[in-house]
Protein backbone atom coordinates (compact mmCIF):
# COMPACT_ATOMS: atom_id res chain seq x y z
CA UNK A 1 0.00 0.00 0.00
CA UNK A 2 1.46 3.34 -0.99
CA UNK A 3 0.53 6.60 0.56
CA UNK A 4 0.84 9.92 -1.13
CA UNK A 5 0.97 13.29 0.48
CA UNK A 6 -2.03 15.34 -0.58
CA UNK A 7 -1.29 18.67 -2.23
CA UNK A 8 -1.53 21.79 -0.10
CA UNK A 9 -4.89 23.49 -0.09
CA UNK A 10 -5.09 25.84 -3.04
CA UNK A 11 -1.76 24.68 -4.46
CA UNK A 12 -1.48 24.74 -8.22
CA UNK A 13 -0.26 21.56 -9.91
CA UNK A 14 3.43 21.61 -10.75
CA UNK A 15 4.36 21.11 -14.39
CA UNK A 16 7.11 18.56 -15.10
CA UNK A 17 9.34 21.23 -16.67
CA UNK A 18 8.97 23.39 -13.57
CA UNK A 19 9.87 20.45 -11.34
CA UNK A 20 13.00 19.88 -13.42
CA UNK A 21 14.06 23.53 -13.42
CA UNK A 22 13.18 24.45 -9.86
CA UNK A 23 13.14 21.08 -8.13
CA UNK A 24 16.80 20.88 -7.18
CA UNK A 25 17.01 22.50 -3.72
CA UNK A 26 20.46 23.99 -4.32
CA UNK A 27 19.04 26.17 -7.10
CA UNK A 28 16.00 27.47 -5.20
CA UNK A 29 17.70 30.34 -3.34
CA UNK A 30 20.65 32.46 -4.42
CA UNK A 31 22.80 31.95 -1.37
CA UNK A 32 22.95 28.16 -1.69
CA UNK A 33 24.97 27.69 -4.89
CA UNK A 34 27.00 30.88 -4.48
CA UNK A 35 28.05 30.05 -0.91
CA UNK A 36 29.02 26.53 -1.98
CA UNK A 37 31.13 27.59 -4.97
CA UNK A 38 32.71 30.42 -2.98
CA UNK A 39 33.71 27.99 -0.23
CA UNK A 40 35.16 25.59 -2.80
CA UNK A 41 37.12 28.45 -4.38
CA UNK A 42 38.59 29.43 -1.02
CA UNK A 43 39.51 25.82 -0.23
CA UNK A 44 41.34 25.48 -3.55
CA UNK A 45 42.78 28.95 -4.12
CA UNK A 46 44.43 29.56 -0.76
CA UNK A 47 46.49 26.32 -0.62
CA UNK A 48 47.33 26.65 -4.31
CA UNK A 49 48.60 30.19 -3.81
CA UNK A 50 50.62 29.18 -0.73
CA UNK A 51 52.17 26.32 -2.73
CA UNK A 52 53.04 28.78 -5.51
CA UNK A 53 54.59 31.23 -3.07
CA UNK A 54 56.69 28.42 -1.56
CA UNK A 55 57.83 27.39 -5.04
CA UNK A 56 56.17 23.97 -4.88
CA UNK A 57 54.05 24.63 -7.99
CA UNK A 58 54.25 26.96 -10.96
CA UNK A 59 51.04 28.75 -11.89
CA UNK A 60 50.60 29.53 -15.58
CA UNK A 61 47.65 31.87 -15.88
CA UNK A 62 46.42 35.15 -17.34
CA UNK A 63 47.81 37.21 -14.42
CA UNK A 64 50.65 36.98 -11.91
CA UNK A 65 50.00 34.64 -8.95
CA UNK A 66 50.04 37.46 -6.35
CA UNK A 67 47.52 39.49 -8.35
CA UNK A 68 45.44 36.40 -9.02
CA UNK A 69 45.21 35.54 -5.33
CA UNK A 70 44.21 39.08 -4.31
CA UNK A 71 41.74 39.31 -7.17
CA UNK A 72 40.11 35.94 -6.49
CA UNK A 73 39.75 36.49 -2.77
CA UNK A 74 38.19 39.94 -3.24
CA UNK A 75 36.39 39.75 -6.56
CA UNK A 76 35.92 35.99 -6.77
CA UNK A 77 35.18 34.78 -3.25
CA UNK A 78 33.68 37.98 -1.84
CA UNK A 79 31.60 38.65 -4.95
CA UNK A 80 30.19 35.12 -4.86
CA UNK A 81 29.17 35.48 -1.22
CA UNK A 82 27.72 38.97 -1.71
CA UNK A 83 25.77 38.00 -4.84
CA UNK A 84 24.35 34.96 -3.05
CA UNK A 85 23.34 37.04 -0.05
CA UNK A 86 21.77 39.82 -2.11
CA UNK A 87 19.76 37.50 -4.35
CA UNK A 88 18.32 35.88 -1.22
CA UNK A 89 17.85 39.14 0.70
CA UNK A 90 16.04 40.91 -2.16
CA UNK A 91 13.55 38.04 -2.24
CA UNK A 92 13.02 38.34 1.53
CA UNK A 93 12.71 42.15 1.39
CA UNK A 94 10.25 42.27 -1.50
CA UNK A 95 8.45 38.95 -1.36
CA UNK A 96 9.09 38.63 -5.10
CA UNK A 97 10.93 35.79 -6.80
CA UNK A 98 14.59 36.25 -7.69
CA UNK A 99 16.35 33.95 -10.17
CA UNK A 100 16.11 30.26 -9.36
CA UNK A 101 16.52 27.03 -11.22
CA UNK A 102 18.10 27.38 -14.65
CA UNK A 103 18.43 31.18 -14.39
CA UNK A 104 20.28 30.95 -11.08
CA UNK A 105 22.35 28.09 -12.46
CA UNK A 106 23.37 30.27 -15.41
CA UNK A 107 24.61 32.99 -13.02
CA UNK A 108 26.64 30.41 -11.09
CA UNK A 109 28.08 29.00 -14.33
CA UNK A 110 29.08 32.53 -15.35
CA UNK A 111 30.84 33.02 -11.99
CA UNK A 112 32.63 29.66 -12.36
CA UNK A 113 33.59 30.45 -15.98
CA UNK A 114 35.24 33.67 -14.81
CA UNK A 115 37.23 31.73 -12.20
CA UNK A 116 38.36 29.15 -14.74
CA UNK A 117 39.19 31.79 -17.35
CA UNK A 118 42.19 32.89 -15.28
CA UNK A 119 43.71 29.50 -16.13
CA UNK A 120 42.22 28.60 -19.49
CA UNK A 121 41.64 31.81 -21.44
CA UNK A 122 43.57 34.86 -22.58
CA UNK A 123 43.40 37.91 -20.35
CA UNK A 124 40.69 39.81 -22.35
CA UNK A 125 38.30 36.85 -22.05
CA UNK A 126 39.09 36.55 -18.34
CA UNK A 127 38.44 40.27 -17.85
CA UNK A 128 35.10 40.25 -19.70
CA UNK A 129 33.82 37.15 -17.91
CA UNK A 130 34.88 38.59 -14.58
CA UNK A 131 33.24 41.97 -15.13
CA UNK A 132 29.91 40.88 -16.60
CA UNK A 133 28.38 39.14 -13.54
CA UNK A 134 27.91 42.20 -11.31
CA UNK A 135 26.03 44.32 -13.90
CA UNK A 136 23.75 41.38 -14.71
CA UNK A 137 22.96 40.77 -11.03
CA UNK A 138 22.48 44.52 -10.48
CA UNK A 139 19.89 44.69 -13.28
CA UNK A 140 18.10 41.62 -11.92
CA UNK A 141 17.93 43.09 -8.42
CA UNK A 142 16.89 46.51 -9.69
CA UNK A 143 14.02 44.99 -11.68
CA UNK A 144 12.77 43.07 -8.63
CA UNK A 145 13.09 46.12 -6.35
CA UNK A 146 11.26 48.39 -8.81
CA UNK A 147 8.52 45.81 -9.36
CA UNK A 148 7.96 45.58 -5.60
CA UNK A 149 7.05 49.25 -5.35
CA UNK A 150 8.96 49.56 -2.08
CA UNK A 151 10.16 53.16 -1.75
CA UNK A 152 12.59 52.57 1.14
Spans of features found by a protein language model:
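Hydrophobic alpha-helical transmembrane segments of multi-pass integral membrane proteins
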Residues: 1-152
Amino acid sequence: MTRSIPPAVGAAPVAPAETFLYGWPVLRLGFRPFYIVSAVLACIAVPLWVAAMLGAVTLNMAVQPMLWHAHEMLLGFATGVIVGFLLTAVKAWTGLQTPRGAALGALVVLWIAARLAAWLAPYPVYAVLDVVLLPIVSVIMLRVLLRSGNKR
